[in-house]
A protein has these predicted regions:
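Transmembrane alpha-helical cores of Major Facilitator Superfamily
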Residues: 1, 92, 126-130, 157, ...
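Membrane-interface helix caps of multi-pass secondary transporters
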Residues: 13, 17, 104-115, 199-200, ...
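C-terminal transmembrane helical hairpin of 12-TM major facilitator-type secondary transporters
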Residues: 97, 120-199
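Extracytoplasmic gate region of multi-pass secondary transporters
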Residues: 7-10, 76-139, 226-230
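A late C-terminal transmembrane helix in Major Facilitator Superfamily
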Residues: 3, 189, 203-237
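Symmetry-related core transmembrane helices of the 12-TM Major Facilitator Superfamily/SLC fold
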Residues: 26-46, 244-260
């Protein structure tokens, strides 16, 4: 939650203190870099590794959906599994969709309503971060209770719904509908990170989790091109609708990957 909440807060502060002139961002970035370094340096002293006898508390509460405990899989073995690559492609696709939306968010608001103040635009765009923060908790609980398939498909479905809502917002020039689209988009993107961690542990075990999980997170190297592609599409067509159709296409790839993993699970069972 700190990731999303911090993004919203820093975005507002950045908008307030950064000069409008060319290169005004340099001082703001320098200050942010110093502050981040100081916070990390101080907080690092409060982290203590658990002892060898530490045992995580048992899960309490209602009914949960879980697959049989996975045997510990080494990173090399994981890279040979079809389920890993299907999930990896899913993570790339939906992460790229989220980054494409975030990179074009302020422009989407301006195109829907050109008379918005800069502070208002920052607040509206910040809703993506807020919903990203809240949604991570919701999706973490959802994976525990309903399992991988529903969690992945809900992310896919929310991205498609986000694009449909934003296409409607562009056609009507409605900031209110843009806000709804950003709320949905933030929730959609929020499901990626908790699903990454839960999937890694459920399918490849806890023994090599410290290496396996970062390997899954390397999807962001490729997903980062989502913002580049969406920017190129806007430059070519002068409309953000192309970005929304890109997001729909990426979500469709995600649907196929999730269904393929389900098919492999059924064969394995």
């Amino acid at each position: 939650m700190g990731f999303g909440g911090g993004s919203f807060l820093i975005g507002k502060l950045y908008q307030a203190w950064t000069p409008a002139g060319v290169g005004g961002w340099r001082t703001s970035f320098l200050v942010l870099g110093i502050v981040c370094f100081a916070v990390l340096a101080v907080c690092s002293f409060f982290f203590v590794a658990p002892g060898a006898d530490f045992t995580a508390p048992a899960v309490k509460g209602g009914k949960t959906v879980s697959r049989p405990a996975a045997a510990d899989v080494t990173p090399g073995q994981m890279l040979k599994k079809t389920t890993f690559w299907l999930y990896y492609v899913w993570a790339i696709a939906v992460s790229a969709a989220g980054l494409a939306l975030i990179s074009q968010a302020s422009g989407v608001v301006w195109q829907a309503s050109a008379d918005q103040a800069a502070a208002s635009v920052a607040t509206i765009v910040g809703l993506i971060s807020i919903c990203n923060a809240v949604g991570r908790v919701l999706f973490g609980g959802m994976y525990d209770k309903y399992g991988r398939s529903l969690s992945m498909q809900l992310v896919n479905g929310l991205f498609i719904l986000t694009s449909a809502v934003l296409l409607l917002a562009m056609s009507r020039g409605s900031v209110a509908v843009v806000i709804l689209g950003f709320v949905l988009g933030g929730l959609a993107y929020s499901g990626v990170t908790p699903t990454n961690s839960a999937f890694c542990r459920a399918y490849f075990g806890p023994g090599h989790y410290p290496v396996n999980f970062p390997l899954i997170n390397t999807n962001l190297i490729f997903a980062s091109f989502g913002s580049t592609v969406s920017g190129a599409l806007y430059d070519a067509g002068g409309s953000y609708n192309s970005t929304f159709f890109l997001i729909i296409g990426l979500a469709a790839v995600g649907i196929v990957c999730s269904l393929a993993i389900s098919a492999i699970d059924k064969k394995g069972n």
